[in-house]
A protein has these predicted regions:
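Bacterial N-terminal signal peptides
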Residues: 1-8
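Recognizes extended acidic, P/S/T-rich segments that occur
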Residues: 58-107
Length: 119
């Protein structure tokens, strides 16, 4: 499975940084691409701001070179949730979005479009 993220395809709609950026405004940070499995792709997109938790990230994908983008589930918004499983894991989620594109075809190259918005 090959993943292709073209810089012009990853877009973030966020206010221009300046001295008076609202704490409610989302500021995109590092985008982490998880190692692909045979049929899934995973993403983590760290952010700053969005104190009102109303930002979102829409996800679309297509086979490399195909014309039509197909919608996937949006990334999940996380900020400060405790993730706990007995003695195996205990962490507080950072300010971020995370999610996956599921049920892909093995041996196929995909393009993924992530669009961040903050009303």
């Amino acid at each position: 499975l090959v993943i292709v993220l073209v810089p012009s395809v990853i877009t973030a709609q966020a206010p221009v940084q300046g001295p008076r950026v609202s704490p409610d405004a989302v500021l995109p940070g590092e985008l982490v691409i998880e190692p692909a499995t045979l049929i899934n792709l995973g993403f983590e997109w760290f952010i700053q701001g969005d104190a009102n938790l109303n930002a979102s990230v829409d996800v679309s994908f297509r086979e490399r070179g195909a014309g039509m983008w197909r919608p996937a589930l949006p990334l999940l918004r996380l900020q400060g949730e405790r993730i706990y499983a007995e003695s195996r894991i205990d962490l507080i989620a950072p300010n971020m979005f995370a999610g996956s594109v599921l049920d892909l075809e093995p041996g196929t190259a995909y393009e993924v479009q992530l669009t961040m918005a903050d009303p």
